[in-house]
């Protein structure tokens, strides 16, 4: 829990008030109000088209809002506020021939990148510090990015994000297309870093069973915040039907379907 000695902005990682966003004349966010507490793993859930990624982009300053306000640790979204933020997207589509190595890619994340191409590998590795060990990618450093598996690539992107020493980590479907062992490893690493660094982690995911296991707080979005609270309070039949418009189970995995609503199928987990 946050110390009572901390200033109030430090206890709220993200505050959104009355956020409206329309894209191509279509209202996506319709007055979103939320406060995300600092130092927790929280999740945004909701059907396709509910505005989850749009809201995440607004947090990053990549999506202009029509009205309302967003503050990150008490500062309006902008250069100062975003210095504390790192982002892990869905898996990027890279050609297998993409030749930049993991080591070279991560060197770009450090502030000591001048002439990095000519530096010795051991010097680069030293500058990357403990992150390469913490994220379990030391054996991958010489591998081209284009040759990595989905799970390996997401661990590399996580390392890139953590090298910024963020206070807030935003994850947009970070394990989409990653196999079950890779997904498990990724979220175990997220949990370890959240606890070690006191990070605030905001996760967008369709995988409700994973959200139930890892999030301390859940926000169900469908244009507005339908409900929020602890997973056991939000992820019940009534609340999920309100968010998704159909009957879904909190123990199921929801894939992108390209339609307005997610289509559930069993994820194979029993709680």
Predicted regions and their residues:
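Conserved ABC ATPase "signature" region
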Residues: 121-140
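The feature captures the beta-strand-to-loop junction immediately N-terminal to the Walker
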Residues: 45-47
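Catalytic Walker B motif of ABC-type/P-loop ATPase nucleotide-binding domains
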Residues: 169-173
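H-loop/switch region of ABC-family ATPase nucleotide-binding domains
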Residues: 205-206
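Conserved ABC transporter NBD signature motif
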Residues: 68-81, 85
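Conserved ABC ATPase signature
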Residues: 144-148
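Helix-to-loop junction immediately C-terminal to a conserved catalytic motif
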Residues: 60
